[in-house]
Regions:
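Active-site region of PLP-dependent enzymes
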Residues: 113
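Conserved amphipathic alpha-helical segments that form helical-bundle/coiled-coil interaction surfaces
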Residues: 24, 28, 40, 45-110, ...
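Short linear motifs at protein or domain termini
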Residues: 1-45, 87, 152, 156-169
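Active-site loop of classical SDR/Rossmann-like NAD(P)-dependent oxidoreductases
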Residues: 117-119
C-alpha cells in the first residue's frame, strides 16, 4: 500500500493513511481517458452484438442496484462496467495496469456516492453503451471524457467539506 501511495510509513513513528494526492488523481484520470477512449473505439468496430452482451448485463445489474438503493454495490459495478468494456476489447491487462494508480481517483469518487450521483453515472454508462452499439466512436469518446471528469465536481465538494483529506501542494 505504500507503493501505491495509500500508506505513509514513518519508521519509529507510525503508519498513516496518506492524504489524497491531486497530482496522482489527475495522472490516473489522464491514463484512464487515453485507455478508455481507445477501448470504446475498438468496441465501436464490433459488428456482432452478441459480443456486447456482457456490457448489457452490467447495465442491467446497475439498474437493479439503483432501484434497490444499493450504492456500495453500485460503486463496485461502476468499476466492473469499465473492466468489462476492457475485457470485451481484449485489453484487460492494460486496464489492470492502471488500476493501482487510480486509487486516489477512486477515493474521491467513494466519498461522494449519493443516490442522484449514481443515477447520473448509470445514465452516462448507458450513453456510452448506446454510442458503442451505434458504432459512433467520437460520441463515445466525448461521453467518456465527460464521465471521467465527474470527479472534478466531487473534488470541489470534498475540498469544502473535508479539506484535511487533501494533500497540500
Amino acid at each position: 500500500l505504500e507503493g501505491v501511495n495509500i500508506l505513509e510509513i514513518r519508521p519509529q513513528i507510525g503508519t498513516f493513511i496518506s492524504l489524497i494526492d491531486l497530482d496522482l488523481v489527475e495522472e490516473a484520470r489522464f491514463l484512464r481517458l487515453i485507455l478508455e477512449k481507445e477501448i470504446s473505439r475498438i468496441l465501436c468496430e464490433i459488428e456482432d452484438s452478441f459480443m456486447l452482451m456482457p456490457m448489457e448485463e452490467q447495465l442491467f445489474k446497475q439498474r437493479l442496484c439503483l432501484e434497490h438503493n444499493k450504492r456500495r454495490e453500485f460503486y463496485g459495478l461502476d468499476n466492473e462496467f469499465h473492466k468489462t468494456l476492457a475485457a470485451i476489447a481484449n485489453r484487460s491487462r492494460s486496464y489492470e495496469l492502471i488500476h493501482n494508480i487510480q486509487i486516489h481517483f477512486d477515493r474521491i469518487r467513494k466519498l461522494n456516492l449519493k443516490r442522484e450521483r449514481c443515477q447520473g453515472i448509470y445514465q452516462q454508462h448507458k450513453s456510452i453503451a448506446d454510442a458503442i452499439k451505434e458504432h459512433d466512436a467520437e460520441k463515445a469518446a466525448n461521453i467518456i471524457t465527460n464521465h471521467l471528469s465527474n470527479y472534478e465536481t466531487d473534488l470541489e465538494k470534498l475540498k469544502k467539506i473535508h479539506p484535511e483529506y487533501i494533500k497540500e501542494d
